[in-house]
């Protein structure tokens, strides 16, 4: 299956992409482990992470408070493991793809280039081959809504949105992301 990926400041001319190349699992793992112990433990970890993250931002060691995104990823992974055991691809151990090059260009622009945070030299557009049986299409709108809910500390809503995401439901205006944890091969570095 031919898919398209944009890589922000991490692609190194390798013949393949690493699942979880950004190492996001290690940040979501404390929230996942806490959920395995119970909701009260999760809440304690969440509020502790809030405090520590704010300290790191104040000290200039982090640009922003990422703990909320990490908590959402932890909740999504917990829901996948406990309620959707048949879903083999984890958001934390995969590569994210787009179905078309144009879509990948748009995502790259919206996520990395529009605000001037990165240059076109730092954001690589790639054509990649990956096994079709390891690729799953989800509506990212549920994930985006979950990030908004966690900003309001509405953890229950995040669980509900994770369930819709993994049940393959679609919003009225779906924003499709394709996750794959299969072996892959970079076929071409595209130009803008």
Per-range role (PLM):
Residues 61-86, 92:
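An acidic/histidine-cluster motif and surrounding catalytic segment
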Residues 2, 9-66, 91-93, 102-115, ...:
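Conserved NAD+-utilizing ADP-ribose enzyme module
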